[in-house]
Amino acid sequence: GPTGPTGPTGPQGAGARTISTAAFTSGDTPLTTSLAAEDTTGNLRYVGNALSGQSTNDQVPGAQITLPAADMKYAITLPTTGRLKEVYADYVVTALEQFTRSAHLYARLYTAPSGSLTFTYLPGSDFALSPAVSGNVPAGTVLSGSVMLDAPVSAGEKMLAIVYLGSDTTGDEESLSGVVSLAALVEV
């Protein structure tokens, strides 16, 4: 039969979603984080510089990290104002490690306003990379994880990513060497 009449025009669409990605990588040199025998939270390593001497060798800091001016190169500047929606990280183990206790590698984000050297922990940005490590952890093991957020961010704001080992128990000193990449999705 004949084609029927054209229906009414539908409502205006919501428009395209605009996104920006902030990416971190440890580069060619493996990044090593360790967990002392008496600790349940290990030392920090800034993503972006596996050779940084600015790690904290006792507990992961609370709410803030103040970087020396020379270490600002490990933070990235956000290009747009929007909402941080998701963070994803991969860590590839580069050397065989032997763990006597179960531990997780964690990632966390900090932000600082433009012109500031003091970074504040971004609430809700802590997440564990899986699987947990225990026993023999061979080179080539991939740990990954992500977290969903809805945090406001501003153009010019700086972001710092860290990784650290954590365990529910004390035990032998543990360390993990690998390369890390982390990306944060900002929706405009």
Q: Where are the language model's segments positioned?
A:
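Extracellular jelly-roll beta-sandwich "head" domains, especially the C-terminal globular C1q domain
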Residues: 15-188
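Collagen/collagen-like triple-helix recognition
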Residues: 1-20
